[in-house]
């Protein structure tokens, strides 16, 4: 059987980790720095005992939040992604000109995102707090995604040469299916800022989760005929169905 059966396979694994600021996109440092007025100081200025203007303890702001405040105080977002890929092939020679083949592949993808943003307070240039500070809250979230995609295919190949006549035929079956699930949770008012876990949030409990799956099944076939190395006829048939 060893001279009739051929087995091959390949696997790959990726483990990816990224840590970024808690705010991104239009609320991120780079976009805010493009929109922030260059005439504003980094910190609000106040006079010292000698009448000179020096930095206060409060960040300045304009029509948008101070990008440096976001850089230093916006918290973090951690993204962990793992991907496992595998593909396996088998080919069995039944008799001369007749082979059966099988291919199976799987892709396993997982992603976890942890985000924590402490409350960032804003003050007027005279040091008085904005009224919006009263509603400011710490925010923590965690989301998880699991995806598994699989493909299975069987083929039966026939090839025969009789004199100058060449006959070929193929019958096949394939199926692809995927299972996907998500789970997420958010909380506000984190009890201890250094402990970034969902259970540390005290109010505004919000949870979400989804699960879905799909499948695609196909049957296909082909018949071809050639004479003296020239293709004269070929017919193909395929039927697909999905869930």
Regions found by a protein language model. Give the residues of each.
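Structural motif corresponding to the C-terminal cap of alpha-helices
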Residues: 160, 179, 211, 225-227, ...
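Short strand->helix junction
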Residues: 109, 242-243
């Amino acid at each position: 059987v060893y001279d009739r059966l051929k087995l091959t396979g390949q696997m790959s694994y990726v483990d990816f980790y990224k840590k970024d600021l808690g705010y991104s996109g239009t609320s991120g440092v780079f976009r805010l720095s493009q929109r922030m007025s260059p005439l504003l100081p980094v910190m609000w200025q106040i006079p010292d005992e000698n009448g000179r203007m020096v930095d206060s303890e409060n960040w300045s702001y304009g029509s948008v939040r101070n990008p440096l405040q976001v850089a230093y105080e916006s918290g973090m977002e951690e993204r962990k992604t793992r991907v496992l890929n595998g593909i396996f092939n088998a080919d069995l020679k039944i008799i001369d000109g007749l082979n059966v083949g099988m291919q199976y592949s799987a892709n396993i993808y997982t992603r976890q995102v942890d985000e924590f943003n402490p409350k960032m307070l804003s003050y007027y240039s005279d040091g008085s707090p904005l009224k919006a500070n009263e509603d400011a809250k710490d925010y923590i979230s965690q989301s998880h995604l699991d995806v598994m995609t699989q493909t299975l295919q069987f083929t039966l190949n026939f090839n025969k040469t009789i004199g100058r006549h060449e006959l070929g035929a193929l019958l096949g079956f394939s199926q692809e299916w995927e299972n996907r699930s998500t789970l997420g949770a958010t909380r506000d008012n984190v009890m201890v800022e250094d402990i970034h876990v969902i259970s540390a949030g005290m109010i505004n409990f919000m949870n979400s989760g989804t699960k879905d799956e799909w499948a695609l099944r196909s049957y296909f076939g082909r018949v071809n005929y050639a004479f003296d190395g020239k293709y004269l006829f070929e017919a193909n048939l395929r039927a697909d169905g999905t869930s």
